[in-house]
Amino acid sequence: MLSKRIIPCLDVKDGQVVKGVKFKGHEVVGDILTMAKAYSEAGADELVFYEISASVEKRLLDVNWVESIARHIDIPFCVAGGIKSVADAARVLERGADKISINSPAIARPELIKELHDEFGKQCVVVGIDSFYDEVTGEYLVYQLTGDPNASSRTRYKTQEWVKRVQDLGAGEIVLNCMNQDGVRNGYDIEQLSKIRELCNIPLIASGGAGSMQDFVDVFKQSEVDGALAASVFHKNVINIGELKQFLTNNQVAARL
């Protein structure tokens, strides 16, 4: 059985790690390099960095910090933020990132997924999907530009159809960001993740809602995702990664100790 991945997520803005609630009200929580090194030493399986304002500001993320991270940690890491072309992705990967993730740029130009797949291989290409549950219609809807509350907007896609499309275009992995759960620590959206798992034949990573170690056990056992991404519970030392992995193992969830 493949080990489940524990993935701290670091939202980056102006060279600092920040965190909000439901994609709003971001506050600075620390230095990128300091936090990356700490998570690597604590036993994280990989890291994800989102430069949250890059797509909104129509620019590529700052590749200088990518190079610094690559020199100082020895676990895989994925980078996202304003990657709109093969050339953009190459700049990030050349600086040492293991994977690149695209979100809003893929919605604007879906063929970008195939271009990245063809150039770098499936294993490098992650697609992030920001999914909002509309309580009125009961539908899961894809949003874009969520790094800025003033720019965030609904797209033409429903989540299920976009999941199918990005797979067809060559995505190697999907990170499903459940917007209603983001930062509130009430548990992952297992119902939504289970529905997406049925459609998804590539690795699926859960994001949004982790509040306790039991939440990780539940999401792995009940929705069968491949990894779980979390931010605030790690940034604020609510959960220790080493203790979490031992807890998973004790609850019959495979984890790298």
Swiss-Prot record:
CDD domains, sorted: HisF (cd04731)
Gene, per the UniProt record: hisF
Pathway: Amino-acid biosynthesis; L-histidine biosynthesis; L-histidine from 5-phospho-alpha-D-ribose 1-diphosphate: step 5/9
Catalytic activities: 5-[(5-phospho-1-deoxy-D-ribulos-1-ylimino)methylamino]-1-(5-phospho-beta-D-ribosyl)imidazole-4-carboxamide + L-glutamine = D-erythro-1-(imidazol-4-yl)glycerol 3-phosphate + 5-amino-1-(5-phospho-beta-D-ribosyl)imidazole-4-carboxamide + L-glutamate + H(+)
Organism phylogeny: Bacteria, Pseudomonadati, Pseudomonadota, Gammaproteobacteria, Alteromonadales
Assembly description: Heterodimer of HisH and HisF.
Pfam families from the UniProt entry: His_biosynth (PF00977)
EC number: 4.3.2.10
GO MF assignments: imidazoleglycerol-phosphate synthase activity; lyase activity
One CC-aspect GO term: cytoplasm
InterPro entries, per database record: Aldolase_TIM (IPR013785), His_biosynth (IPR006062), HisF (IPR004651), IGPS_HisA/HisF (IPR050064), RibuloseP-bd_barrel (IPR011060)
Single biological process term from Gene Ontology: L-histidine biosynthetic process
Subcellular location: Cytoplasm
Active site, UniProt feature: 11, 130
Record-linked Gene3D superfamilies: Aldolase class I (3.20.20.70)
Superkingdom classification of source: Bacteria
Keywords annotated in UniProt: Amino-acid biosynthesis, Cytoplasm, Histidine biosynthesis, Lyase
The family this protein is said to belong to: Belongs to the HisA/HisF family.
Function of the protein: IGPS catalyzes the conversion of PRFAR and glutamine to IGP, AICAR and glutamate. The HisF subunit catalyzes the cyclization activity that produces IGP and AICAR from PRFAR using the ammonia provided by the HisH subunit.
Protein's name in the database: Imidazole glycerol phosphate synthase subunit HisF
Keyword Acyltransferase: no
